[in-house]
Amino acid sequence: VEVCPTGALTDLKPFSLQEREEALLPCRAACPAELDIPAYLRAIADADPDLALSIIYEKAPFPGVLGMVCNHPCEEACRRGELDQPVAVCNLKRFASENGAPPEIQPQFPPTGKKVAVIGAGPAGLTAAFYLNSYGHDVTIFESEEKPGGMLRYGIPEYRLSRPVLDADISRLLRGIELRTRTALGKDFQLAELLNGGFDSVFLSTGAAHSKKLTIQGADSAGVYWGVDFLRELSKGNRPSLGNRVVVIGGGNVAFDAALSALRLGAKEVTLVCLEAEAEMPAFEKEITHAREEGVKIMNSWGPKAIESQQAAVTGVILKKCTGVFDEEGKFRPSYDESTLERVDADNIILAIGQEPDQGVVFGAGMPSAGKSGFFKVKGTGTDIEKVFAGGDAVRGPASVIRAISDGMRAAREIDGFLGGKGRLDASGRETSVVAGPGPEHGTMSPKIGRDEKFSERARTALGCLDPEERKKSFSPIESGYSAEQARTEASRCLQCQLRFQIQGVALPPEKWLVLDKKALEGVPPKEGVYQLADEKKITTRIAGTQNLLQALAGELEKESAGYFQFEEDPMYTKRESELLQKYLQKY
């Protein structure tokens, strides 16, 4: 990092603190959970995975999960990508979670006596519960399924997210929290019962774990599955018997997960059909790459017209050409060329066209207001029912895991504030840490930078990956993590933009001329002294002594005789006036 030592070269324009962070630390600014990415990368480069994991835990209680399934918006923003490829931030997070010693989780505040109910044990709900518990509140989670995790457990296959990793993260964050499983809102209890039963606040994190339905001919035929439901049953150990030919309809992550799962269940041919063109598919790039490697055929810009069947069993699907996905206003409104059709043989169809909340729960008695699609309406995270907050997919729709964690953290802050706390702020106004050990400065890290002659040549380190044919035989994780040497090498590719962020602007000499206006005159005393006036070019036009500086300058302001002024108190103002006049004459 090099800066001008004289301060003659400065930023073209002044930055606010937030603007400076976004401009100079793009990775951290892009992370919804506000992870201190440069800090934990530096710790890994210094061979300290324990510290790296501790830093991650400060903002995200799911290090193992995020190391495997985060969509890493930080990498999209990484400045190293402008040189060659972004730093593999997600892979390094995985290394820290697999090799670092989990830090001791410490309560931030003593018990408050307040009770909070969290409905839904997905990533948003679990995160909110974790932080609310650390703030000293008594937290109870209500979960309709047998186990916690939400879409992490029931929507992401094991080959992408190892269940031991998921279980380890959840078990750590649940310490001190009561979990009630197989307890469904609207069926086993009502919202009003919680509000009237001693809970001081309720957080709705009920998710969007239901498949959107498609009303086309044959959708009710035997052999037709719905994407999220298909993955949920698979995660529960209920493996459906599929035929040799499977067609998946959809272009998102659920569709690709269904396609790869179908291969692992024995399907010989899997075709994925989506409305979007190849560059527009919403699924993560890695998912698309893995699908192509495993032999999934992708048909872009096609949509389903009808499902064909014989004796109520699927035989194929008729497709129509999609000419556009969004209208001129950017709204989802597909258009088709009905004259261009194609038929694909199939023994099974998996419809994965989107997700939505459980409409029966959302629009049940005594629930907060929601839009037509079933997503709760909120201001911040607060709903239109006092004490009730909502967040995660139940508000924004299906989103990433890191976004759900961010929503849960925000909800915890707002609920804590509602209950009389101060959120994550300590007495100094700085966010407190939920882990024992290094504080926000992470001062144990090496400050040494030095010169690395091969720095620019260092290529991104890829994760180990099973052979495509081998990985289709089981639901074992596709990728393996870094070795210690690989992790240090990859972490050392970081440009360390945080160093530039920590260099504050050079203090310039104070401006001697003040703008002649009412605000500036508020700082002028009604005392004896000398003042000078200047024009718009800051050339002196008047030097005068006075018994009352404030009164004299107020008069000059009324006359609009100058644009700038300066003053100095001096009881011997006539003498000082003469001195200044002499200096002026000598200069000009």
Place the predicted regions along the sequence by residue.
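Ferredoxin-like iron-sulfur electron-transfer modules
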Residues: 1, 9-30, 51-72, 102-119, ...
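Iron-sulfur cluster-binding cysteine motifs and their immediate structural context
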Residues: 1-16, 26-46, 67-96, 140, ...
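Beta1-alpha1 glycine-rich phosphate/pyrophosphate-binding loop at the start
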Residues: 34-44, 53-54, 60, 82, ...
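Feature captures the FAD/FMN-dependent oxidoreductase FAD-binding
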Residues: 51, 110-111, 115-119, 167-216, ...
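Glycine-rich dinucleotide-binding loop and its adjacent helix/turn
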Residues: 95-109, 171-187, 211-265, 369-385
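FAD-site-proximal beta/loop scaffold in flavoenzymes
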Residues: 220-243, 307, 327-398, 402, ...
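A conserved FAD-binding loop/helix module that cradles the flavin
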Residues: 394-425
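GIY-YIG nuclease catalytic motif and its immediate N-terminal context
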Residues: 505-555, 568-581
